[in-house]
């Protein structure tokens, strides 16, 4: 697994041993970032269930302003990958339960232009992930939440003010894009 383009192009990322982490495939990541286009530039990024950090580090490599990477178990790998890409200065790594850290970020008044959520497939609680982001008002105005889930998992059409805007399937993965519903 590697960073596809940008300032850290070609940098190989370390993955944890075993099969507890399922990083987003390079091909899927490439398609995702092609769809996101220029919205990544200068974005404040939140990566929930960050694993290897591939999504946030790819965003930083492509010009995102900053990223918060959250995972319960891969803190050391996130730090190593941020250092490998020379993007550690823009990457804030938080170790802990994703829902608890999301609540902390909300209490701090933090908002993000782009939120990646990549929980384990068959985690069965994608609605909870979306509700945590919506309840904490973590998504900035005009922001986008990108949820990766298993292709066979049920799609959540809405959670709080977040509404499904579009979805795409890539092999065993489905990428769902959510934005805040327009008011008025």
Indicate residue ranges for each PLM-predicted region.
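Class I S-adenosyl-L-methionine-dependent methyltransferase catalytic core
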Residues: 1-184
